[in-house]
Amino acid sequence: MKGKSLFNVFAVLAIFSLALSACGGNGSPEQPAGDGPKVTSAGFECPEPNPRVEVTSTELNLFVWTEYFPQDMLECFELVYGITLNRDEYSSNEEMYAKVSAGGTAYDLVQPTDYIVPLMIRQGLVQELDHAQLPNMKNIDSNWMDQPFDPGNKYSLPYLAGTDAIVVNTATVETIPTSWADLWNPEYAGRMVFIDDSRATIGLTLVTLGYDPNTTNPDELEEAKNKLLELVPNIKLFDSYSPKTALIAGDVDLGMVWTGEAFIANQENPDIQYIYPEEGPVLWQDNWLILKDSSHLDAVYAWLNYTMQGDVFWLTIRDFQYTNPNQAALDYAKANEPDVYNAYADSPITNPPPEVVAKGFGIEDVGEATPLYDNIWVEVKGGN
């Protein structure tokens, strides 16, 4: 599906989910690698690597999103391979890019969202994948591969995907928003949480003005900046570490969050609802990239293959309910963990309806216009 967009991917998967419905290194236990089953601190029995990659490295350095990895997955990799995972976390693409582009890090793998991938490729920060060392790449649904931001997946592999949309506590908010534009309602002053995502926030603001969310027009961006500054009094906090926490605690009543955060908040409190705005949600995909100076390539390929196994990656469906590109994981969960699978497959949060996807928009690389967006965000964040 050359040249396809995330819009097409979500559309295909939304239709597929309807068909299914119609049919019905951190704190791991100290067990040495070797013979016999390995069990995590939570009692999960670790699947054997298939295939097992030969490694000599003793560590792997990850720079990844916060709250994005099942603890059992992390522990199992350490247990079955005897490799220590060193994991640093970031809460925005911009934070990750700034640190990596400055140099001097020892990271092996990072996890950028789609629009950052071309930038990192252009900057020479990453290396090509060796597909011959990735037999478990076959487990990824082909609809998520060969995206415009990395044709042929020369550099990137999908991890998870999802949407940004409106979240609202229907028990505490009198006027329920149905559009991005509604969030400017003064009734919401000091009551909102927003993920700390410059491009998504500026993009949705552009959409409310009738502009392309990826515009490079300075006049349109200036107009968006001024409108976004009007929204700032409504935002109590920007939080990409765990925006659901403030919602569940009642510190805020509504805002803009990711798929997985909304799912968990709704599970904790059914009054917290995820609303797809009339203008459409933001559609996104997070991906693995190997940094050019990685010194643990054997461990990198061991990690990628192990975590792409269906009997391992299904843990993301259990613990972090984002849209899942790994077909083997979905098949495994459906056959072996039906409650987990059904909660995922039946949710409009993890599987947006086709009519919602049709309105959705993605964030794209804007090239030389990137500093214009950066400057807007500095000014906006200076007011909050």
Where are the model-predicted features located?
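Short, low-complexity disordered leader/linker segments with a strong preference
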Residues: M1-E59, N384
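Early extracytoplasmic/lumenal segment of secretory-pathway proteins
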Residues: D35-L119, T245
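Extracytoplasmic ligand-binding site segments that recognize negatively charged/polar headgroups
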Residues: L60-P70, E95, A106-D251
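A ligand-binding cleft/hinge motif common to bilobed small-molecule-binding domains
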Residues: I116-L119, I248, L254-D271
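Ligand-binding "clamshell"
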Residues: I121-E128, D150-K154, N234, I264-Y276, ...
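Periplasmic-binding protein-like
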Residues: G162, L221-E230, E268-S294, P338-Y341
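Mature extracytoplasmic/periplasmic domains
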Residues: L291-V357
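Conserved C-terminal helix/tail region of periplasmic/extracytoplasmic solute-binding proteins
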Residues: T350-N384
